[in-house]
C-alpha cells in the first residue's frame, strides 16, 4: 500500500510541475496595446505580438494582437499585409507592452 501511495504522490507532483511550467502569454487585441495573461495550449512554444498599422485610424495607433503560437510565425503565414510587425518570445508573459 505504501508503494502505491508513493506512486500516486509522484504522479500528482509531476502533473503539478507540468502545469507550473506551462507557457502563459498575453492573449488579446486592441489599438495601442493590450494585456490579458492566460495559459497557452500545450503545444504552444512562443508568445507572439503583431502590430498592424491601420491607415484609416485617426489616432495612428497600431492594432496590436497578442497570442500563443507554435513557433514564431512569419507575416505571410498569418495572412497579414505589408504594414505589420511581429515579435516573438519564449518565456511566460513575455509579450507585454
Curated annotation (Swiss-Prot):
Disulfide bonds join 25-47, 28-34, 40-68, 72-88, 89-94. Residues 23-95 form the UPAR/Ly6 domain. The keyword Lipid biosynthesis does not apply. Residues 1-22 form the signal peptide. GO terms for cellular component: extracellular space; plasma membrane; synapse. It is found in: Secreted. GO terms for molecular function: acetylcholine receptor binding; acetylcholine receptor inhibitor activity; acetylcholine receptor regulator activity. One of its GO terms (biological process) is acetylcholine receptor signaling pathway. It comes from the Eukaryota. InterPro entries: Ly-6/neurotoxin-like_GPI-ap, LY6_UPA_recep-like, Snake_toxin-like_sf. The keyword Secreted applies. Keywords: Disulfide bond, Secreted, Signal. Pfam families: UPAR_LY6. Its main location: secreted. Interacts with CHRNA3, CHRNA4, CHRNA5, CHRNA7, CHRNB2 and CHRNB4. Interacts with CHRM1 and CHRM3 probably in an allosteric manner. Binds and may modulate the functional properties of nicotinic and muscarinic acetylcholine receptors. May regulate keratinocytes proliferation, differentiation and apoptosis. In vitro moderately inhibits ACh-evoked currents of alpha-3:beta-2-containing nAChRs, strongly these of alpha-4:beta-2-containing nAChRs, modulates alpha-7-containing nAChRs, and inhibits nicotine-induced signaling probably implicating alpha-3:beta-4-containing nAChRs. Proposed to act on alpha-3:beta-2 and alpha-7 nAChRs in an orthosteric, and on mAChRs, such as CHRM1 and CHRM3, in an allosteric manner. This is Secreted Ly-6/uPAR domain-containing protein 2. It comes from Macaca mulatta.
Amino acid at each position: 500500500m505504501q508503494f502505491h501511495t508513493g506512486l500516486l504522490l509522484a504522479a500528482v507532483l509531476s502533473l503539478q510541475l507540468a502545469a507550473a511550467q506551462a507557457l502563459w502569454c498575453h492573449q488579446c487585441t486592441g489599438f495601442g496595446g493590450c494585456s490579458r495573461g492566460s495559459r497557452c495550449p500545450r503545444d504552444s512554444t512562443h508568445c507572439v505580438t503583431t502590430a498592424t498599422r491601420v491607415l484609416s485610424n485617426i489616432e495612428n495607433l497600431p492594432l496590436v494582437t497578442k497570442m500563443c503560437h507554435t513557433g514564431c510565425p512569419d507575416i505571410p503565414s498569418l495572412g497579414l499585409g505589408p504594414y505589420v510587425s511581429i515579435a516573438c518570445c519564449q518565456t511566460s508573459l513575455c509579450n507585454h507592452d
